[in-house]
Amino acid sequence: MNSIQNLENSRSDHAQTIITKTTCPYCGVGCGVNIEVQHKTQGVAVQVAGDTEHPANFGRLCIKGSNLADTLGLETRVLNPMLGRKNHRSVTTWDVAIEKIADQFQSCIDQYGPESVAFYVSGQLLTEDYYVVNKFVKGYLGTANIDTNSRLCMSSAVAAHKRSFGEDIVPASYEDFEHADMVVLVGSNTAWCHPVLYQRIMQAKSQNPDLFVVVVDPRFTSTCEQADLHLPILPGQDVALFKGLLQYLYQHGYADHQFVESYTEGLQALLEANRTEQDFRAVVKRTGISAEKLQLLNTELD
């Protein structure tokens, strides 16, 4: 846990209670958490509560954050390599475990070739760790089958932010939801993946019934249930949708030309390149979104 701040340290003959402020380590909402630890004669008791003063969650926690205490003890943590399946595992040494893994890799490669094995590694490795594992997989085993959580999770966002804003930063705050007229969620089942943030959106909508919530997702998710408009887009056609929206907004006079001139580049070239293929009918055809729903989105943008 990072940036831990002790709030209370009360001592007695029987127990020492320490409450620390920290941040939930799971999703990107960054909820504040108060961890209460009691050091008793018979062990350590841990309780978790949302930080009511934290600007991200104001005391709210989702089920993952609420169960953080379950991850702090050593009772269910694997501390040694284990061999076996399900309830028939036994503790072994690192030497035996590494030899077992190597034998399995060698057997697959001998029988089916190096393309028969693959690695999926963490997004939290150090740069040096990434270098070593890539050398091992590509240079030694001879396969390109390696991927990380980073590519699916944040690398794409980093690239998009840098190209759009010049820096890997999100130029918005959660308070913006309370002042928004429209919220568009793209490919995000926010109700499940970021439930605390979703509650803030729904609270903003309850206070402002005119807030129009749009969900762009091939699936009908729990987030769609409370949305005003669900756009069941075909997979991989998000860019086509946004190019079409760009054309619509520009053609109907919604462009802030002073802002465009001062802070963007390449807009005219983009508009010209997509002038013929991104009209209303083309967007309907490519995205699979019905003309009625697409027109409703355009109308709400007006």
Model-found features: residue ranges?
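Short, solvent-exposed loop/beta-turn-alpha elements that line the ligand-binding surface or hinge
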Residues: 257-258
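Active-site phosphate/pyrophosphate-binding segments
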Residues: 245, 262-302
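N-terminal export/assembly segments and adjacent metallocofactor-ligating motifs
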Residues: 1-252, 266-270, 290-294
